[in-house]
Design a protein with these regions (language model features):
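Flexible "arm" and connector segments at domain edges
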Residues: 1-81, 85-125
Length: 125
């Protein structure tokens, strides 16, 4: 499925769950923040794993479907990023915008932006 198809399914899901009728853009933004925090925790967990912990986990796993700590943290991060996308798609719809249009508008602003990396973050000029 492409992004537009998935977005339409997310919007229909939100409609079916009553999110548009019973929530507000600010409450949806709170949900986005909640998902962002969960994603940050998963990425921090991934970053804190040492090679020895990963190796120990892999060596201790059996053939019964156990996954390593690293794979678990990656799965949590993937879930968190997906959940953030869902909340952003719903938020855009709540304010009568299309998330793809929002992304395109943001890209149009940043595509020629100059700046530099400072402490692992891009800082615009």
């Amino acid at each position: 499925m492409n992004y537009e198809q998935l977005s339409a399914l997310v919007i229909q899901w939100g409609e079916d769950k009553g999110i548009f009728a019973k929530s507000t853009p600010l409450r949806q933004l709170d949900k986005t923040q909640e998902e962002l925090n969960e994603t940050k925790e998963a990425l921090e967990k991934l970053a804190s794993l040492t090679n020895q912990e990963i190796l120990d986990d892999v060596l201790l796993s059996d053939d019964f479907g156990n996954i390593s700590l690293e794979e678990d943290a990656l799965a949590e991060a993937k879930d968190g990023i997906g959940d953030m996308l869902v909340t952003i798609i719903l938020l855009a719809k709540m304010v009568n915008m299309d998330s793809v249009d929002c992304l395109e508008a943001a890209y149009d602003v940043i595509k020629k932006r100059t700046g530099k990396m400072v402490d692992g973050q891009f800082v615009k000029d």
